[in-house]
């Protein structure tokens, strides 16, 4: 018991533990497990952003090799870069924040209503999937006014540029016990 507490203190001394970083609102299940696996396999941010490790690839073969290897090696880091870009996009767009608030507010109201009694519309019981579709339909005009479509494409484009640039220009690290194979041209 004491050894387990010492290990937990050591992990917290290194940084925030995965359980404190994950929001309590994410329910237990596949999504939470996936996010915990991503958090557990994240590479050190120091080596991820080390400026001395960036250089121009010598040829197209090296570029392709870097892209494949870095995307595989830094996959979890890239997921968090993507999530950071989404957060940046939402925070810097007040109308998108309003649209998200309307959508999640409608979902929350429907959730509270189903706790009290079943939702009946025109004499028929409405399933939870249809209720959330109704919430999406109600909030759709707000998303349209907020320019959510352009925000989605901005996030995708920015992600491709940032991750693609990093993967192309970051030098490949030799993994323990594995050396790079050079083929003659």
Swiss-Prot record:
Ranges that cross the membrane: 79-94, 95-112, 132-148, 149-165
GO CC terms, sorted: Golgi apparatus; plasma membrane; synaptic vesicle
Annotated region (Homodimerization), positions in chain: 175-185
Keywords linked to the UniProt accession: Cell membrane, Cytoplasm, Cytoplasmic vesicle, Golgi apparatus, Membrane, Synapse, Transmembrane, Transmembrane helix
InterPro entries, alphabetized: Prenylated_rab_accept_PRA1
A Pfam family annotated for this UniProt entry: PRA1
Disulfide bonds: none
Keyword rRNA processing on entry: no
Membrane topology of the entry: Multi-pass membrane protein
Side Cytoplasmic, residues: 1-78, 113-131, 166-185
Signal peptide positions on this chain: none
Subcellular location: Cell membrane; Cytoplasm; Golgi apparatus; Cytoplasmic vesicle, Secretory vesicle, Synaptic vesicle
Region (Required for interaction with GDI1): 165-185
Keyword Nuclease (UniProt): no
Annotated stretches, region: Required for interaction with prenylated RAB3A and VAMP2: 30-54, 175-185
Function noted in UniProt: General Rab protein regulator required for vesicle formation from the Golgi complex. May control vesicle docking and fusion by mediating the action of Rab GTPases to the SNARE complexes. In addition it inhibits the removal of Rab GTPases from the membrane by GDI1.
Family in the record: Belongs to the PRA1 family.
Subunit structure: Homodimer. Interacts with VAMP2 (synaptobrevin-2), prenylated Rab proteins, GDI1, NRDG1 and PCLO.
Protein name according to UniProt: Prenylated Rab acceptor protein 1
Organism: Sus scrofa
């Amino acid at each position: 018991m004491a050894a387990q507490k010492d290990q937990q203190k050591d992990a917290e001394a290194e940084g925030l533990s995965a359980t404190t970083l994950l929001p309590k609102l994410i329910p237990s299940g596949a999504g939470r497990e996936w996010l915990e696996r991503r958090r557990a396999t994240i590479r050190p941010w120091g080596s991820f952003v080390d400026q001395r490790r960036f250089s121009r690839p010598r040829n197209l073969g090296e570029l392709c090799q870097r892209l494949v290897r870095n995307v595989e090696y830094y996959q979890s880091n890239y997921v968090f870069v993507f999530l950071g870009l989404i957060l940046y996009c939402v925070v810097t767009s007040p109308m998108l924040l309003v649209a998200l608030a309307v959508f999640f507010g409608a979902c929350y109201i429907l959730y509270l209503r189903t706790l009290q009694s079943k939702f009946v519309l025109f004499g028929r019981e409405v399933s939870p999937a249809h209720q959330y579709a109704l919430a999406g339909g109600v909030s759709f005009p707000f998303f349209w006014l907020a320019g959510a479509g352009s925000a989605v494409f901005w996030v995708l484009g920015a992600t491709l540029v940032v991750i693609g640039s990093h993967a192309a220009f970051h030098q490949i690290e030799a993994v323990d016990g594995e050396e790079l194979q050079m083929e003659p041209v």
